[in-house]
Amino acid sequence: MITSFDLRDVPLVRQLDGQGIPMDTEAALTLGVHLLRNALVSYIAMGERGLPTFVLRKGANGDRICALAQLRHRTGAERARILYIAPRLAPDEAVSGVWLGLLDHLTRVSGARGAQSLVAEVPIDSPAVETLRTAGFAVYTRQEVLRLDLPAGAKPGGVVPEEGIDTGSTRLRPRRSEDMWSINLLYANTAPPLLQLAEPPPGSQDDAWRRGYVLEDKRRGDVLAYLQVKQGPVGLCLKAWLLPDAEDRAGELVAGALRLAQPVRPRPMYWLVSRYQGWLRGLLADNGFVEWASQAVMVKHTVARVGAEPARARAAALEHPKLAVPVVKAGRLPPHDPAHAANH
């Protein structure tokens, strides 16, 4: 039976802590895994803090199996993410069946909370990939995690001035509200359409831990790239989107990112690279990053999309993609002319 966490489940959560698999890479690498704290916060806030926890108890005596699953979802948001499932998969069918029950429950709960899709990130060689497929998830992309260990004497990046960091022919500066048109256009021109169903547009989820920066052409003022930096107690996580015809500026983007993202105290820095951004791996390796993990980003839709082809069929094509992304030049919106609009 699967139930929502309550105070009687505290011993079980403590018992399963460290025995499962994190499925939200950014959260795990920056904030760490805090099952009991998350469960208690969500319990006290009656689920409104977006970290609902569910426990499962099955069988009796020596055949008893206990498990838990944790979800991250802000009520009404389009996407939910699985934070953690425990215990890890084992060769016996009993644990696999427990996982399938939890995954089905998470899908139904996510849909009831307003989410249209449920996302999980798991190691590409993990048995979890096949179990998630059985539960109706599909691989939308592969993601490489690269790691850079900053030396103990690294100088903190500090606060980035509003005018930004000079990176040569470009500057890397904090995102402003007027940049959102260019950022959304950049995202539409770089992320494959199917993947856009799995991840929110950059800049739409800034919070106390996450900050956004744009790489701007100093001469023309065009937005060439967007950098997302999430800092937490245990690490930093970076992700970038760069216009296809601006790949020659990628070196300036990485150099600027390393200057602004250095933490006050030594913590590892991670860069998430989707498969369609493979050209970025070599550049990061030249700057000291090493391959740390290879993951499958898997998605299940909680509602049927009217008029859309099945997501599973489209996802299969993405595993061996031949991307031909149309490029629209990111520019400024034309000024609004009320007189001209009135004549039309």
Residue ranges of predicted features:
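Conserved GNAT acetyl-CoA-binding A-motif
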Residues: 110-122, 263-275
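Phosphate/adenylate-binding glycine loop and adjacent helical scaffold
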Residues: 129
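Conserved acetyl-CoA binding element of GNAT-fold acetyltransferases
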Residues: 77-93, 232-247, 251
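Amide-forming acyltransferase catalytic core, primarily the GNAT-like/NAT-type
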Residues: 1-62, 66-69, 134-235
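Short, structured motif recognition centered on aromatic/hydrophobic residues
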Residues: 54, 80-83, 103-107, 118, ...
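Conserved acetyl-CoA-binding loop-helix of GNAT-fold acetyltransferases
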Residues: 92-108, 134, 247-261
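Active-site/acyl-donor-binding loops of N-acyltransferases
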Residues: 123-125, 135-159, 268-344
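Structural motif
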Residues: 5, 57-59, 69-70, 121-124, ...
